[in-house]
């Protein structure tokens, strides 16, 4: 019995950060389900709504490197507890305030709290599981975590319609608090932590290592390409997709959220599929292909006038698959730096990636206000027609195409540099 208990103990410990990782997807998608209510609550336009959505990503991105350092210095139990409680309190603040600036602060804090989601899972896996199981457990974690994105769509929308958004928001806030306290009282580190991915000797964070990343033009171009291509997920999928579908096809919120959920279904399969493609065709070719495919999907989507749920589900499923290009970006980045700089490189790329969400939400909101036709509802809140949505969302395929061009050029340049190095090594060996 004791052996059996110890056999399943790592999975029990893994459960707590995993629950928070899945939960934070629901808070991330919350504005997409509440656009009209939020605009009415704070008497704001699309530009301010985009800013409100963007502040989540500001908080999330700026904490990537600090959270990684905190998890190494303190236990995962303490850090996940603090950040989960912060998420819950910030969600309560957002629910009950009518002050727009407090709402901005609360969304920023929710982003800060959510930043420990994946990093906390990674830390616990590295402590409790053998090194050979790390990749498999990370894959399982992403699969379970994306369920938060799936259930954060239509199911949550249906609950909102039944019980009201404020009641649902309060329940979600208390769930975060419960996860935090459960983690604090139940999660532990192994008494004898065996060497694993995070336990192998490594250098502590040094400014010189970070400077090496910031002075690499290839890393910057890779990061900028990633930012430009992230609009399909963090711009459209996270926030603007649901209101767009409701306006374009006159469907209810639940059906629109259900269609958007196919993006997250696609992401369940995208990681392994694109990894196989990258081995055959190369990282940069696959990333470029994903960007051009995104552009094509959005051209088809924005030109479509007839509501066809099967067609839309298929497009969003494919979109979800190619949104996993971000995994290949990390792989490409790892090949550009020395092993000692790998961790800080991944954190930097992920930071810029999440800033892409802030960029797209802000720009989309601004463009919507530019093309606002002047309609207001009974509360005096702006109503945006389909043309405002189409003009604003056109930024997504334009940026995806631009990012693809940059990434293809970077791929050619990296390959040329690699060939030159090999040629020099060959000449030296021959000499």
What are these regions (language model features)?
Residues 73-83, 279-292:
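Cytoplasmic membrane-interface "Motif A"-like loop-to-helix N-cap segments
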Residues 63-75, 271-282:
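Helix-to-loop junctions at the C-terminal end of transmembrane segments
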């Amino acid at each position: 019995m004791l052996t059996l208990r110890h056999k399943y103990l790592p999975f029990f410990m893994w459960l707590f950060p995993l629950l928070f990782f899945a939960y934070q997807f629901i808070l991330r998608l919350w504005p997409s389900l509440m656009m009209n209510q939020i605009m009415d609550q704070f008497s704001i336009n699309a530009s301010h709504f985009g800013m409100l959505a963007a502040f989540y990503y500001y908080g999330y991105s700026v904490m990537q490197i600090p959270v990684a350092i905190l998890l190494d210095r303190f236990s995962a139990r303490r850090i996940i507890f603090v950040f989960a409680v912060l998420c819950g309190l910030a969600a309560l603040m957002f629910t009950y305030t009518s002050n727009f600036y407090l709402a901005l602060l609360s969304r920023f804090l929710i982003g800060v709290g959510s930043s420990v989601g994946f990093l906390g899972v990674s830390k616990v896996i590295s402590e409790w599981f053998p090194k050979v199981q790390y990749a498999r457990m990370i894959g399982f974690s992403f699969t379970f975590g994306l369920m938060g994105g799936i259930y954060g769509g239509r199911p949550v929308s249906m609950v909102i319609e039944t019980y009201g958004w404020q009641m649902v928001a309060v329940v979600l806030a208390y769930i975060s608090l419960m996860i935090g306290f459960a983690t604090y009282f139940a999660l532990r580190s192994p008494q004898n932590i065996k060497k694993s991915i995070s336990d192998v000797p490594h250098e502590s964070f040094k400014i010189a290592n970070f400077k090496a990343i910031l002075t690499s033009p290839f890393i910057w171009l890779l990061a900028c390409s990633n930012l430009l291509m992230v609009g399909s997920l963090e711009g459209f999928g996270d926030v603007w997709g649901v209101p767009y579908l409701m306006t374009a096809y006159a469907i209810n919120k639940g059906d629109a959220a259900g269609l958007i959920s196919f993006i997250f279904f696609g992401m369940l399969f995208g990681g392994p599929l694109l990894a196989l493609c990258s081995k055959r065709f190369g990282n940069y070719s696959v990333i470029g292909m994903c960007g051009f495919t995104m552009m094509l999907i959005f051209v088809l989507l924005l030109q479509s006038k007839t509501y066809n749920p099967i067609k839309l589900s298929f497009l969003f499923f494919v979109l979800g698959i190619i949104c996993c290009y971000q995994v290949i970006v990390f792989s490409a980045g790892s090949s550009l730096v020395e092993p000692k700089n790998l961790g800080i490189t991944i954190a930097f790329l992920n930071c810029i990636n999440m800033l892409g969400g802030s960029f797209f939400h802000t720009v989309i909101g601004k463009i919507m206000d530019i093309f606002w036709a002047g309609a207001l509802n009974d509360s005096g809140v702006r109503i945006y027609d389909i043309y405002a949505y189409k003009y604003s969302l056109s930024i997504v395929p334009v940026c995806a195409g631009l990012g693809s061009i940059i990434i293809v050029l970077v791929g050619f340049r990296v390959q040329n540099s690699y060939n030159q190095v090999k040629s020099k090594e060959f000449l030296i060996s021959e000499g």
